[in-house]
Amino acid sequence: MHLKEILAQFSFFTAIPVKSSASLEEIAESSYISPIIVGISLGLIESVAYLILYRILGELTGIVLLGIIELLRGFNHLDGLLDLGDALMIRGNREKKIKALKDVEVGSGGIGLLLVYLSIQIVALLKLDFSLYTIFYLISSNVLSMSLSLYILSTISPIPESNLGRIFHDKLKGKSTILLLELIPFISLYNVIVFIIFYMIMYKICGSLGGSSGDIAGASITLSFPLFLITDEITNLNYSLLSILCYLFSHLH
């Protein structure tokens, strides 16, 4: 793995200012590493920001962290969420849904899905506290949400209109197993259930649209992140390797 490939993942999936000359094909080729490299990095940055700001803002830090999370992502995935919301609201044939998916204007469906996301995200972030578990929660949720979105792109054929979806699908063929294996240290038994249910829902949505796309992948990252996070918080990462690691760290003297 070369430094160029690593930097390319940060340049594509985040708003972190790194220079990369990699093409979209090169980024897609090595994107299977992004859940580990980018996901863990984002989780650590968000954790440090939360723990520092908690000393000043207390329990309200979760609201500020929402802005930090979206800034780190560059609002790119949020755009996919809005587009998907508009497409889901369309009653008609596939062509009308695709037109809504590609439309730059935001309709009622996009606003509605945004409100759903914000509601879940705010609840999840306000449940965080000043503890070691917060670090592991955020790392786990970032890794899982990125892995899920790439797994969708790798296993569901893209819509003809999505160049990004086509490239990622072609480059990730045969790597879906790797994406699942990467999850093992970070996923709890309960989030396995969340992963499966979310994938089944997106599979159904992709079926109505004719395939996957970059917008669907972005929406999947955005929506699944708070779901994974709130599940981790409720279950304390039970039955995961991270929970064992967290327990050992918290009991070191």
Curated annotation (Swiss-Prot):
The keyword Oxidoreductase does not apply. Keywords: Cell membrane, Cobalamin biosynthesis, Magnesium, Membrane, Transferase, Transmembrane, Transmembrane helix. GO terms for cellular component: plasma membrane. It catalyses: alpha-ribazole + adenosylcob(III)inamide-GDP = adenosylcob(III)alamin + GMP + H(+); alpha-ribazole 5'-phosphate + adenosylcob(III)inamide-GDP = adenosylcob(III)alamin 5'-phosphate + GMP + H(+). GO terms for molecular function: adenosylcobinamide-GDP ribazoletransferase activity; cobalamin 5'-phosphate synthase activity. It is an enzyme of class 2 (transferase). It comes from the Archaea. The keyword Transferase applies. GO terms for biological process: cobalamin biosynthetic process. The chain crosses the membrane at residues 33-53, 106-126, 132-152, 178-198. Pathway: Cofactor biosynthesis; adenosylcobalamin biosynthesis; adenosylcobalamin from cob(II)yrinate a,c-diamide: step 7/7. InterPro entries: CobS. It is a multi-pass membrane protein. Its cofactor is Mg(2+). It is found in: Cell membrane. Its EC number is 2.7.8.26. Belongs to the CobS family. Joins adenosylcobinamide-GDP and alpha-ribazole to generate adenosylcobalamin (Ado-cobalamin). Also synthesizes adenosylcobalamin 5'-phosphate from adenosylcobinamide-GDP and alpha-ribazole 5'-phosphate. This is Adenosylcobinamide-GDP ribazoletransferase. The lineage of its organism: Archaea, Thermoproteota, Thermoprotei, Sulfolobales, Sulfolobaceae. The gene is cobS.
